[in-house]
């Protein structure tokens, strides 16, 4: 839209003309012409038909009193980068929806990609435009993207000028702590900034969809657990975290602890894509935690995320899931699942589902 001079003229003279054309009519970066929102809303009321317009944008626009919420007319959808399933790195053998609805055993032993392949895919990322690039080229693109975010994008949504060096340093700090409960204070100490500055910069990065908070799960059930409330934070794609700290696949193979953090972030990302739901995490006061929690088909799903798939890892994760679930009183029993970077998907004798990320589908 920023290059469509004809649209500028239409909006300033005959705005209704801009809405004419084949449907669905797409307005990219619509937030640069915020008057489109109310124009589209009124046109939807007039046409009384679904699927008329798609408004896309790389930033969330600032709220305006004059802009109607669009309730009942405009649905909001957060776009994400490709999941493993969408990029062809999962064979789709295990349907998440079927597993939750039926709890039927779904086994698969096909090796789609091994752990080294998973790490390479995480370092490459799920951006469609980078799909045919090498890992090195994709990471170089992402580092350039981070630079653009720090110098341009973070200021575009509200016109507030921010220090690009601090923005870049903040993104690197978030990358190092991806999928963990980093406090504002610890981030401020890490990058040498005031807490207020960190909070404001984080809000700006969320507004342009670079940072996403994984909020703590809050249960309405009777429970013996006192749940913590701190969020975890993720970048838009785990590859962005890898690129921010110059973590090539070879470096990640030599630092499996950080690779495990990226894998947790990848699984949280993919669960959100495949389920269409908001993904939470949970930790109680004793330190017992579950990496991902979401609701699907009327059931609560608890997920532990493990890059490895040794018997010891599976037994410990299954025990942890059962212990956490037992702290609540359930009307409908929860689904317990371990998502791994291994090549086996099966039902554990305890009833816990073990699923490879490379087998997972919607």
Predicted regions and their residues:
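Conserved nucleotide-binding/hydrolysis micro-motifs of P-loop NTPases
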Residues: 4-5, 58-63, 81-85, 240, ...
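Structural recognition of the conserved hydrophobic beta-strand(s) that form the central parallel beta-sheet
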Residues: 26, 52-58, 78
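Interdomain hinge/linker elements that couple catalytic modules in large macromolecular machines
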Residues: 92-251, 255-262, 266-269, 280
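Short regulatory helix/loop adjacent to the ATP-binding pocket of P-loop NTPases
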Residues: 61-76, 89-92
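Helical "lid/switch" subdomain of P-loop NTPase nucleotide-binding domains
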Residues: 29-32, 36, 59-60, 70, ...
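A cross-kingdom feature that marks ATP-driven nucleic-acid transaction machinery
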Residues: 1, 204, 210-362
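A short alpha->loop->secondary-structure connector
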Residues: 44-51, 69-77
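Conserved nucleotide-sensing/catalytic segment adjacent to the nucleotide-binding pocket
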Residues: 4-52
